[in-house]
Amino acid sequence: MTNSIEQAWDLAKQRFAAVGVDVDAALTRLDTLPVSMHCWQGDDVTGFEDPDGVLTGGIQATGNYPGKARNATELRSDLELALALIPGPKRLNLHAIYLESDTPVARNKIEPRHFSHWVAWAKKHQLGLDFNPSCFSHPLSADGFTLSHADPEIRQFWIEHCQASRRISAYFGEQLGTPSVMNIWIPDGMKDTPIDRLAPRQRLLSALDEVISEKLNPAHHIDAVESKLFGIGAESYTVGSNEFYMGYAASRQTALCLDAGHFHPTEVISDKISSAMLYVPRLLLHVSRPVRWDSDHVVLLDDETQAIASEIIRHNLFDRVHIGLDFFDASINRIAAWVIGTRNMKKALLRALLEPTDRLRQLELRGDYTARLALLEEQKSLPWQAIWEGYCQRNDVPVDARWLDAVREYEQQILSQR
């Protein structure tokens, strides 16, 4: 460490020790908490299936910042820079549309070999991989239905796509030695008020059971399901509602995915974590930033991001919660978006680990809510930034906003040529 950072580090450790926090233990724990970065920030959820395809499914990437990745080589290059600017363990989250093939491949025919380059790259960079079937931006999803489709042939196509995706996910886990979390999200819903809300959910229930019927090694693959309140073009009815997937995950013992933008604007997923964990074995979190709707803005170090991290740490959910990011902003430098959002998630985890939780919990149990509030607020002023800077330097990444210099240089030399 540089002298100034080392001095600040030593003083900060003393301050935290005075309130009963072991900084070294906190950092050891932080190094066991990977954040899964989402590949789709790098190309606005375009994928490699059809570079000229239109994004559908009630989601939208807004903006036209230059330098968007156009192929796997460019995307991996962009990711490598982002990874080099973020301290601590990371993973990469892939969608099925990021396959690599010299010839077109039907989505229900995708195989592990179509992702072999991703696996080789992940091994090189010591990353785990997570996966998602892509049930959108496809002719057979154009009417707004996939796994709940009334046409059995179309429904079967999407069942087969999800089944193929599970095998790819298991391949990731087997090859990389860390389980791949595969999340199923579908856009199925209606723009206006439906007459029959039940039948699509019955079809979805049956389809999901068929999707997960093949037994896969849990050391390689973990199933997750994700709800949503609404999407563009599906404002009045979403088949995969929160109640549907909460019931499904609890009854089938899959992981439940909570996306920060998939609920009513007055709801927060930090308040849902402790309840859901009573009924499901695992949670997958999609940390995002909804602005008035599921806008998927870049994650900030705001109150909700901090609350999400605090829930994980306070309840020792390290082995049951998988932390992923889900945002896509095309109005700013896409590499910077990754770096900002992921560093903020890690800052939130660090701050949560530096909280004197046991002391605060004892005050709460004694009913001393005055002291609880006072200490909770005072600990916000403790010098966590000095610990963060030391952690960054230990991991050979820029300590402060100097990481932006590397992004600007790359933008000038590489992105501007695209």
From Swiss-Prot:
Keywords noted in UniProt: Cytoplasm, Isomerase, Manganese, Metal-binding, Rhamnose metabolism
Cofactor: binding details: Binds 1 Mn(2+) ion per subunit.
Pathway where this protein functions: Carbohydrate degradation; L-rhamnose degradation; glycerone phosphate from L-rhamnose: step 1/3
InterPro entries: L-rhamnose_isomerase (IPR050337), Rhamnose_isomerase (IPR009308), Xyl_isomerase-like_sf (IPR036237)
Annotated catalysed reactions: L-rhamnopyranose = L-rhamnulose
Similarity section: Belongs to the rhamnose isomerase family.
GO biological process entries: L-lyxose metabolic process; rhamnose catabolic process
Role according to the record: Catalyzes the interconversion of L-rhamnose and L-rhamnulose.
Protein name: L-rhamnose isomerase
Stored Gene3D superfamilies: Divalent-metal-dependent TIM barrel enzymes (3.20.20.150)
Positions that bind Mn(2+): 262, 294, 296
Location relative to the cell: Cytoplasm
Keyword Cytoplasm attributed: yes
Domain of life: Bacteria
Subunit structure: Homotetramer.
